[in-house]
Curated annotation (Swiss-Prot):
Stated name of the protein: Oryzain beta chain
Pfam families with a match to the protein in the record: Granulin (PF00396), Inhibitor_I29 (PF08246), Peptidase_C1 (PF00112)
Residues the record marks as carrying a glycan: 341, 389
SUPFAM superfamilies xref list: Cysteine proteinases, Granulin repeat
Disulfide bridge positions per record: 162-205, 196-238, 296-347, 386-398, 392-413
EC number: 3.4.22.-
UniProt GO cellular component terms: extracellular space; lysosome
Propeptide segment residues: 22-140, 362-466
Protein species of origin: Oryza sativa subsp. japonica
InterPro entries reported in the protein's UniProt record: Granulin, Granulin_sf, Papain-like_cys_pep_sf, Pept_asp_AS, Pept_cys_AS, Pept_his_AS, Peptidase_C1A, Peptidase_C1A_C
Length: 466
């Protein structure tokens, strides 16, 4: 009993601790064979269900997935991920490695996670990499850099269920270079890029390239603020008025020489840099803390930002800003291995890096964007015509209130559609309880059913005047 209580307490701590972490890196699919193998060990079903209930509460009643009939399947996915996290952390505690946690992605299979939250298109850049690189001659570099400490990085944002990571990466580096040049941190609009930047390979929530985002901002003469053009996490029509609100501009952008971590370090020593990585693995999905050394390849699928670098107990790392909200990883960041003797860098971080350039002031402050005109209300539904003289409101039922022989002289209205008109000429019953019990003033589901509701009262029908 004491052991069970201790195990349950451990699980609760695991879930609460993961309220600030999470993604994955082992590309293990959740299929029947994997699920069956995973359920043989680790937390019991009762412990997992208790942890799942707590996780649901921590995540506002559920993840981005509909629960309903999916509830049990979501639980089984959660249980399998819980075992994966538990086993990984047990090994990490022995070796001093990075830790995983049950974050907002904990009820997603790895396939679901990859399909929903990634979005960098990296088949080819819009220009050859390394045409120009201003930091090529730099040799002396600081041992560590963290642009967050300089106020040059905006708070972590959340791209939601939209493959717009490329827009978040590009906007973040533009925010940073603007702060470094002008001294003002202005949060900018990812939604403008999602909806208006259709140049090159950019296609909104279906992915894009940071270089093409920079190119759009240059050709557009600037980009609007997040406050004026807020993020919606869906594709939409470009708002021309807001697209023309050019608040922050850049002069150009440069690509870091590919497959060269030293060149990337030189760039990051001067400003935050947009980078692409492979982020679709299970360990990255559920990452919580520490220097990430998990499994990953170089199939670049996610745009992020390198905002610094450093060393922890002899482990060199990059500080990487993600766009999955502050409850993922280390308050929205991941520290990734650096100098791993692989030219591409960890998860391909040195393969496609670039940064915006800026030397002057921003465009003049634009006039306030006129408000979007309100959507006109839909036309009201037509009245329900009882006869030539009387009608009832839409969504109601005509019931005769006074008749003579087969002729109804006065009509009444029951407040629901498809109602049963009771013989007392004063009440009616909803369609789910169609049997009138006029003496009791109730309506039953069927003749002998014990289920009943209070009968509805009719109102007088409207006299047609036209």
């Amino acid at each position: 009993m004491a052991a069970r209580a201790a195990a349950a307490a451990f699980l609760l701590l695991l879930i609460v601790g993961a309220a600030t972490a999470a993604p994955d890196m082992s590309i293990i699919s959740y299929n029947a064979e994997h699920g069956a193998r995973g359920l043989e060990e680790g937390p019991t079903e009762a412990e997992a269900r208790a942890a799942y209930d707590l996780w649901l509460a921590e995540n506002g009643g559920g993840s981005p997935n509909a629960l309903g009939g999916e509830h049990e399947r979501r639980f089984l996915v959660f249980w399998d991920n819980l075992k994966f996290v538990d086993a990984h952390n047990a090994r990490a505690d022995e070796r001093g490695g990075f830790r995983l946690g049950m974050n907002r992605f904990a009820d997603l299979t790895n396939e679901e996670f990859r399909a929903t939250f990634l979005g960098a298109k990296v088949a080819e850049r819009s220009r050859a990499a390394g045409e120009r690189y201003r930091h090529d001659g730099v040799e002396e570099l600081p041992e560590s850099v963290d642009w967050r400490e300089k106020g040059a990085v905006a708070p972590v944002k959340n791209q939601g269920q939209c493959g717009s990571c490329w827009a978040f990466s590009a906007v973040s580096t533009v925010e940073s270079i603007n702060q470094l040049v002008t001294g003002e941190m202005i949060t900018l609009s990812e939604q403008e890029l999602v909806e208006c930047s259709t140049n090159g390979q950019n296609s909104g929530c279906n992915g894009g390239l940071m270089d093409d985002a920079f190119d759009f901002i240059i050709k557009n003469g600037g980009i609007d603020t997040e406050d004026d053009y807020p993020y919606k996490a869906v594709d939409g029509k470009c708002d021309i008025n807001r697209e023309n609100a050019k608040v922050v501009s850049i002069d150009g952008f440069e690509d870091v020489p590919q497959n060269d971590e030293k060149s990337l370090q030189k760039a990051v020593a001067h400003q935050p840099v947009s980078v692409a990585i492979e982020a679709g693995g299970r360990e990255f999905q559920l990452y919580h803390s520490g220097v990430f050394s998990g499994r990953c390849g170089t199939s670049l699928d996610h745009g992020v930002v390198a905002v610094g670098y450093g060393t922890d107990n002899g482990k060199d790392y990059w500080i990487v800003r993600n766009s999955w909200g502050p409850k993922w990883g280390e308050s929205g960041y991941v520290r990734m291995e650096r100098n791993i003797n692989v030219t591409t860098g960890k998860c391909g971080i040195a393969m496609m890096a670039s940064y915006p350039t800026k030397s002057g002031a921003n465009p003049p402050k634009p006039s306030p964007t006129p408000p979007t005109p309100p959507t006109p209300p839909p036309p009201s539904a037509p009245d329900h015509v009882c006869d030539d003289n009387f009608s009832c409101p839409a969504g109601s039922t005509c019931c005769c209130a006074f008749g003579f022989r087969n002729l109804c002289l006065v009509w009444g209205c029951c407040p629901v559609e498809g109602a049963t008109c009771c013989k007392d000429h004063a009440s009616c019953c909803p369609p789910d309880y169609p049997v009138c019990n006029t003496r009791a003033g109730t309506c039953s589901a069927s003749k002998n059913s014990p289920l009943s509701v209070k009968a509805l009262k009719r109102t007088l029908a409207k006299l047609n005047t036209a």
